[in-house]
Amino acid sequence: MKTIIALSYIFCLVFAQDLPGNDNSTATLCLGHHAVPNGTLVKTITNDQIEVTNATELVQSSSTGKICDNPHRILDGINCTLIDALLGDPHCDGFQNEKWDLFVERSKAFSNCYPYDVPDYASLRSLVASSGTLEFINEGFNWTGVTQNGGSSACKRGPDNGFFSRLNWLYKSGSTYPVQNVTMPNNDNSDKLYIWGVHHPSTDKEQTDLYVQASGKVTVSTKRSQQTVIPNVGSRPWVRGLSSRVSIYWTIVKPGDILVINSNGNLIAPRGYYKMRTGKSSIMRSDAPIGTCSSECITPNGSIPNDKPFQNVNKITYGACPKYVKQNTLKLATGMRNVPEKQTRGIFGAIAGFIENGWEGMIDGWYGFRHQNSEGTGQAADLKSTQAAIDQINGKLNRVIEKTNEKFHQIEKEFSEVEGRIQDLEKYVEDTKIDLWSYNAELLVALENQHTIDLTDSEMNKLFEKTRRQLRENAEDMGNGCFKIYHKCDNACIGSIRNGTYDHDVYRDEALNNRFQIKGVELKSGYKDWILWISFAISCFLLCVVLLGFIMWACQKGNIRCNICI
């Protein structure tokens, strides 16, 4: 009995060597693409969530926490507002003739001189900020019959009463205040900015004590404009021990124009002019510290990198900055569609192509080949198709940045209370712009992602078709991204297929012969290997059972004697 069972087993092993799957005269070549265990979800035009092997975040959502001092020239206002520095508040004297790209105003800034207001504060602030300089030129105005350089205890300069250094407070000399009528031409090639003011006493007595006349008037004009201001005498809330005020005005004199000042009292006269420069300097309110670093883009929260096309840190920016959007995240696909590799390929270790899943561990390329032949198995990347895909994807991020980065600044808008409706309209317009940009950004990224996925799929298909054209009738498409090669194909042969030097005519006769032989015994089902192995195992089992049954029957009849020795 032992002999018969042993012979049956040997017979099965011998028979097994003739199964098609173990024939050394064939090989399997699969084409596939890179895959990762955990991909990144992105949005496309046709799919809200599709997994890709790699993606780049396009929204900058955090700042450095500090304002970088390079490459922009930052001027820290510290305790001074720009207007206080412009007027010459005593505690802002250190800002005289300073220059900046960005003037940073702090929340702790305060005025420490005569109480004042600026009827068009926002326009003056913006005008001076964009000029980027406090360069001041003194001029010799001829004020006759009046006392100059008035001061106040509310504006101490050291131990003495003082006033704004860029303004000249005129008041009566003796008991007279003659009418002042002075002119100052602009013979330069640039605009001149003159700052002047009107004093509003708190009482009629203060008015006559300073200017003699019960009511003064100030008129400042050029060829293009004229401003007339009549002082409003009356008490106001007390500030630094005073209930009177100074209103600040400004006039721009163009080259070739002339400044004319006429007044019979209450004039706060200019001492000279500020040079106006054209540029892209600006001002920003921020409490972020200024640090030693480099960043093109600055927000009130601090500097941010501008290597992304979008940001949601702050709407207010300066420099070359990403476009502000509402989204916290927008991911740009920089890899292909991700189909994680199946961890088990059956008990016989079969390989599969891109139709079934991707391949993990392809670190040297996105597309490649796996093969199974008489020399074993192997894998290699296809660098040409990989590079073709990478070249087209690499430029995407730069193109999106070029489309969206602002090469100018977005300043905060300020309006006085009487301009409330304008402010509401401005806010509505800004919000609408942000909504529109946010929608455009999402659409742009979805379109780019769709193109990337279609592109990488196309490169995979191109490589597959290229391989099919090389093999022709020497191989059969197995339907899963693999080819069954009907001739002996060693590693050198596989290499020739990969590099495009394969000559199908060399192997044509062998392939045709093997194809006809194998086709005679192969099943057409996609599960033919399984069916063959299962039927083979059942046949061997039944053969053993039949032989064992025959032996048992023969023993019972006495035809065979079985001795068991212990």
Curated annotation (Swiss-Prot):
Record keywords, A-Z: Clathrin- and caveolin-independent endocytosis of virus by host, Clathrin-mediated endocytosis of virus by host, Disulfide bond, Fusion of virus membrane with host endosomal membrane, Fusion of virus membrane with host membrane, Glycoprotein, Hemagglutinin, Host cell membrane, Host membrane, Host-virus interaction, Lipoprotein, Membrane, Palmitate, Signal, Transmembrane, Transmembrane helix, Viral attachment to host cell, Viral envelope protein, Viral penetration into host cytoplasm, Virion, Virus endocytosis by host, Virus entry into host cell
Topology class, membrane: Single-pass type I membrane protein
GO-annotated biological processes: clathrin-dependent endocytosis of virus by host cell; fusion of virus membrane with host endosome membrane; fusion of virus membrane with host plasma membrane; viral budding from plasma membrane; virion attachment to host cell
Designated name of the protein: Hemagglutinin
Note: Major glycoprotein, comprises over 80% of the envelope proteins present in virus particle.
GO cellular component terms given for this protein: host cell plasma membrane; membrane; viral envelope; virion membrane
Function: Binds to sialic acid-containing receptors on the cell surface, bringing about the attachment of the virus particle to the cell. This attachment induces virion internalization of about two third of the virus particles through clathrin-dependent endocytosis and about one third through a clathrin- and caveolin-independent pathway. Plays a major role in the determination of host range restriction and virulence. Class I viral fusion protein.
Family: Belongs to the influenza viruses hemagglutinin family.
Record localization: Virion membrane; Host apical cell membrane
Annotated signal peptide: 1-16
Originating organism: Influenza A virus (strain A/Swine/Colorado/1/1977 H3N2)
Lipid attachment points (S-palmitoyl cysteine): 555, 562, 565
Cytoplasmic side: 552-566
